[in-house]
Amino acid sequence: MDISRWLERHVGVQLLRLHDAIYRGTNGRIGHRIPGAPPSLLLHTTGAKTSQPRTTSLTYARDGDAYLIVASKGGDPRSPGWYHNLKANPDVEINVGPKRFGVTAKPVQPHDPDYARLWQIVNENNANRYTNYQSRTSRPIPVVVLTRR
């Protein structure tokens, strides 16, 4: 394992957990924008198996009025839990900073004609990390379009 991958796993994950706790704990007042990082939103879903409320912070990009998130899980072979949750119930809520509102989630897969354009937007927004994540897995990484209801 190279040093950048080790740092990502052992330092980066801890920083992400801290950021997530602060962002959720302040209901979006702190954590929306961090210098040098893409903006984050809070995604509120209902557990597909448990029916329990779930919240996670994710970086996002914009495409017009839509918010774009990526189900990368850092290139893990499995999709993140939140992705399964929104597939089961696509009507979810997000916080962008302290503003919370309803959105409808639409996963976009590589076979979709708009995928390449959306992938370019999110990948450039996140310093080309998603290309690196995709190289770690054979699973196609979907882009999720969140449209305000």
Curated annotation (Swiss-Prot):
Q: How does it sit in the membrane?
A: Peripheral membrane protein
Q: What are the subcellular locations of this protein?
A: Cell membrane
Task: List the GO terms this entry assigns under cellular component, sorted alphabetically.
Answer: peptidoglycan-based cell wall; plasma membrane
Primary enzyme class:
oxidoreductase
> What InterPro entries does the record tag this protein with?
F420H2_quin_Rdtase, Split_barrel_FMN-bd
Which residues bind coenzyme F420-(gamma-Glu)n per the record?
48-50, 54-59, 70-73, 81-85, 130
Question: What Pfam families does the annotation carry?
Answer: F420H2_quin_red (PF04075)
Q: What is this protein called?
A: F420H(2)-dependent quinone reductase Rv1261c
Source organism per entry reads Mycobacterium tuberculosis (strain ATCC 25618 / H37Rv)
